[in-house]
């Protein structure tokens, strides 16, 4: 494959041709452009690189710095994890309060129906607990914003 200088020279010669043979030079320049394919990228290996030997004291110092850096990263991550856990607990507590208020609102709204159920002969104490849990959990169909607006 011709080197770059030869290709460039050929291209320059193609463009500097006379106007009488303009059509011929156009077809030649198209051909020369098509011949111009990028060279395959050179591959490098690390075997051929000159590397400097690092002294033992430098390696020990680098390991110590890496260990210190790793320890500081671990501390910040554990601090962030504690913050996340606390935030999740706070969100869960607020959600629990909203569900309790939702249950109270439902109990007030359906108090007559609940009294009618309690007077039935097949109604038991566990039935009341199950019904209360069911009503409370029905608040899970709403997101926090909707549940808050229902309670207020």
From Swiss-Prot:
Point to the regions of Basic residues compositional bias. Answer: 1-10
A GO CC annotation recorded here is: preribosome, large subunit precursor
User: Where are the annotated segments for Disordered?
Assistant: 1-51
Instruction: Report keywords, A-Z.
Output: Nucleus, Ribonucleoprotein, Ribosome biogenesis
Q: Indicate the segments annotated as coiled coil, or none if absent.
A: none
Predominant localisation class: nucleus
Domain of life from the UniProt record: Eukaryota
Q: One GO BP annotation here?
A: ribosomal large subunit assembly
Cross-referenced InterPro entries: Ribosome_Assembly_3 (IPR051898), Rsa3_C (IPR028217)
Localization per record = Nucleus, Nucleolus
Nucleus recorded as keyword: yes
Cite a single Pfam family from the UniProt record. Rsa3
Q: What family does this belong to?
A: Belongs to the RSA3 family.
* Subunit annotation: Associates with nucleolar pre-ribosomal particles.
The free-text function statement in the UniProt record for this protein reads: Required for efficient biogenesis of the 60S ribosomal subunit.
What is the protein's name according to its record? Ribosome assembly protein 3
State the organism named in the record.
Answer: Ogataea parapolymorpha (strain ATCC 26012 / BCRC 20466 / JCM 22074 / NRRL Y-7560 / DL-1)
Q: What is the lineage of its organism?
A: Eukaryota, Fungi, Dikarya, Ascomycota, Saccharomycotina
